[in-house]
């Protein structure tokens, strides 16, 4: 009995530490067999979809390939620093959105996929409460998008959890057993339950610099989301320039290879004091989402929320023809 108590305490401490120490952790293995499949998947996309037991197949379009695109050697390692904060939307993504709508995706909903930097305590939820944000004159044009996605901003995503890394997001062990089907991954569960047309993907941790696995699993997530005819928006993070544990190069490369929207938050944080980070070099500095207040706009969180809103607005306007 004592052994069980100690084991539970250890597991709890590990989960709590996962988002406090960005260098901690390792990738969990994705099961190669489930209750409905006993054969190991033969491709990255197969690995991503093997655990889904309830999602009906959606129509596909010709340019959605299950093969990972070959990296393009012309993209510089620091290319993200010169890319726009607000994404440019490709024709491919417009096609994904249109096919998704034809398949029944909800144009009024978006979902979030990510770790502790995506919890409703700090991220986007204030846009569902007019008393908790202020756009000011400069950003007043964003209000129609806030209204359009009402309810999605403060919704608790089934694919967001402190300590959830890119591997865990595709692992059924991390799914909510009360709301998700047996063998369903957190991402598959969130897409089934919320039926979004757009998702933000913001995975902040990189586990002692294991960027090879980070790249592998993030590509898997992007491929799965595209296979469900949902538009993914990939996010860069605030980073200290010269950091050897940078994920922004990987994120940018994947967005480039798949022609998916890049929400380049990392660039908006570069001019901020301490690059928008607290003393630990990972968590963002805090202030309210009052975008007409110069003091608020010296901190990391207002910029993360503002640029996320700008990215969602830009993608929604492009895919819906509201240029």
Where does each model-flagged region fall?
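Loop/turn elements at helix/coil->beta-strand transitions in domains of secreted/extracellular proteins
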Residues: 106-109, 194-199, 226-233, 258-261
């Amino acid at each position: 009995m004592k052994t069980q108590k100690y084991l539970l305490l250890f597991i709890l401490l590990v989960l709590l530490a996962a988002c406090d120490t960005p260098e901690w952790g390792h990738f969990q293995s994705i099961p190669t067999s489930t209750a409905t499949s006993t054969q190991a998947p033969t491709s990255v996309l197969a690995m991503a979809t093997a655990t889904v037991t309830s999602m009906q197949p959606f129509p596909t379009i010709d340019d959605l390939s299950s093969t990972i695109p070959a990296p393009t050697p012309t993209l510089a390692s620091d290319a993200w620093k010169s890319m726009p904060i607000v994404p440019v939307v490709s024709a491919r993504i417009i096609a994904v959105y249109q096919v998704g709508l034809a398949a029944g995706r909800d144009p009024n909903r978006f979902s979030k996929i990510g770790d502790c930097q995506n919890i409703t305590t700090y991220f986007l939820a204030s846009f569902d409460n007019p008393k908790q944000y202020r756009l000011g004159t400069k950003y007043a044009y964003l209000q129609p998008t806030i209204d359009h996605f009402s309810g999605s901003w403060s919704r608790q995503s089934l694919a967001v959890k402190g300590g959830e890394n890119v591997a865990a997001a595709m692992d059924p062990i991390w799914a909510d057993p009360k709301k998700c089907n047996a063998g369903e991954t957190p991402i598959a569960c969130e897409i089934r339950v919320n039926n979004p047309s757009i998702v933000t993907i913001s995975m902040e941790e990189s586990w002692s610099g294991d960027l090879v696995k980070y790249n592998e699993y993030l590509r898997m997530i992007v491929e799965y989301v595209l296979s469900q005819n949902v538009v993914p928006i990939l996010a860069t993070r605030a980073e200290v320039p010269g950091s050897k544990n940078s994920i922004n190069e990987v994120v940018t490369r994947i967005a480039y290879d798949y022609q998916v929207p890049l929400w380049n938050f990392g660039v908006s944080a570069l001019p901020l004091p301490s690059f928008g980070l607290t003393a630990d070099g990972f968590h963002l500095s805090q202030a309210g989402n009052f975008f007409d207040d110069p003091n608020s706009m010296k901190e990391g969180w207002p910029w993360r929320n503002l640029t996320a809103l700008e990215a969602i607005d830009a993608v929604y306007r492009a895919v819906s023809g509201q240029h």
